[in-house]
Curated annotation (Swiss-Prot):
Principal location class: plastid
Name this protein carries in UniProt: Large ribosomal subunit protein uL22c
GO molecular function: rRNA binding; structural constituent of ribosome
Function according to Swiss-Prot or TrEMBL: This protein binds specifically to 23S rRNA.
Stored InterPro entries: Ribosomal_uL22 (IPR001063), Ribosomal_uL22_bac/chlpt-type (IPR005727), Ribosomal_uL22_bac/org-type (IPR047867), Ribosomal_uL22_CS (IPR018260), Ribosomal_uL22_sf (IPR036394)
Organism in which the protein naturally occurs: Nymphaea alba (White water-lily)
């Protein structure tokens, strides 16, 4: 995993995850804009195979935020989450009479960006 930071955003990137981008987007669309705790609950309860690598990536991004920036995990939310298509791993499956059929295994790249929620002070309003 490659981790990049810029400004107040914490970015985590997982590359070459062995699933199609369409199946990963189905999960990413559910967690975009949610808080960190709510995201972990959603990912634990969803029955899809894509949840586990996304769970690990969100957990890693939050650990980077608390360790490198000293941010509280309760104040974090997912400001940006995207899934891009990776390379297609091509294999050959042996078939009858010396033939072979191609097997195309898609991969994807998942990017999670965490930001800190702004704290509003209502005493000054």
């Amino acid at each position: 995993m490659i981790k990049k930071t810029s400004g107040t955003e914490i970015r985590a990137l997982a590359r070459h995850i062995g699933m199609s981008a369409q199946k990963a987007r189905r999960v990413i669309d559910q967690i975009r804009g949610c808080s960190y705790e709510q995201t972990l609950m959603i990912l634990e309860l969803m029955p899809y195979r894509a949840c586990y690598p996304i769970f690990k990536l969100v957990y890693s991004a939050a650990a980077n935020a608390s360790h490198n920036r000293g941010l509280k995990e309760a104040d974090l939310f997912i400001s940006k989450a995207e899934v891009n298509e990776g390379v297609i791993v091509k294999r050959l499956k042996p078939r009858a009479r010396g033939r072979s059929y191609p097997i195309k295994r898609p991969t994807c790249h998942i990017t999670i960006v965490l930001s800190e929620r702004p704290n509003f002070n209502f005493k000054n309003i």
